[in-house]
Curated annotation (Swiss-Prot):
Record's bilayer topology term: Peripheral membrane protein
Name of the protein this chain belongs to: NADH-quinone oxidoreductase subunit C
Protein localization: Cell inner membrane
Subunit structure: NDH-1 is composed of 14 different subunits. Subunits NuoB, C, D, E, F, and G constitute the peripheral sector of the complex.
Catalytic activity: a quinone + NADH + 5 H(+)(in) = a quinol + NAD(+) + 4 H(+)(out)
Biological role: NDH-1 shuttles electrons from NADH, via FMN and iron-sulfur (Fe-S) centers, to quinones in the respiratory chain. The immediate electron acceptor for the enzyme in this species is believed to be ubiquinone. Couples the redox reaction to proton translocation (for every two electrons transferred, four hydrogen ions are translocated across the cytoplasmic membrane), and thus conserves the redox energy in a proton gradient.
Enzyme class: translocase
Taxonomic superkingdom: Bacteria
Length: 204
């Protein structure tokens, strides 16, 4: 399907979801829908069951953190329609306290993806039967894919051979931060003269 066909498909889907789908776009040969996060179950059910669309295959779900936005996160779903031989991306903006309904009643395969979104971003999925952390430890502090999460984390976890158990300790940086000067006099004349480069002004 070319871009015009995808645009027509997007208009048809948006028209079938009045007040729920707020827009669509086509880029790089793929259709993207923007929807209301609170109505995501209705969106998924229509995309799966409507004979015009039949997006019956759930591919994945993820999120993106945009700290500068009022609605900080963008939750993203990808579906595939074997009937149309097309994919669709479904996006919804959510805030830190927005409750997003689980879609596992429509696509059971979304189970662990929803747990991952909670674990790594802190997005709360309601109606999920087992909303526990998935990739981090039970006592983990914070959500590591948020852009304000420190690169070093808050604690380090290691196995202590003396105590014969895993222990948690404050992060220790064994080497102080160093700033390196990567400028080189051999990279070309546009570079500034480095201190101690006595031959900088000599031309052969």
């Amino acid at each position: 399907m070319d871009d015009n066909g995808l645009d027509t498909l997007g208009q048809t889907i948006v028209g079938a979801l009045p007040g729920i789908a707020t827009g669509h776009s086509v880029g790089f040969g793929q259709l993207t829908l923007t929807v209301d996060a609170g109505k995501i179950v209705e969106v998924m059910r229509l995309l799966r069951d409507d004979p015009r669309f039949r997006f019956i295959s759930f591919i994945d779900m993820t999120a993106v953190d945009y700290p500068g936005r009022a609605e900080r996160f963008e939750i993203v779903y990808h579906l595939l329609s074997p009937k149309l031989n097309e994919r669709v991306r479904v996006k919804a903006e959510v805030g830190e306290t927005t409750l997003v309904p689980s879609i596992i009643e429509v696509f059971p395969g979304a189970d662990w993806f929803e747990r991952e979104a909670y674990d790594l971003y802190g997005i709360v999925i309601t109606g999920h039967p087992d909303m526990r952390r998935l990739l981090t430890d039970y006592g983990f502090d914070g959500h590591p894919l948020r852009k304000d999460f420190p690169l070093t984390g808050f604690v380090e976890v290691r196995y202590d051979d003396d105590q014969k158990r895993v222990i948690y300790e404050p992060v220790r940086l064994n080497q102080e931060f160093r700033k390196f000067d990567f400028l080189s006099p051999w990279e070309g004349a546009d570079y500034p003269v480095l201190p101690g480069d006595e031959k900088a002004g000599v031309k052969s």
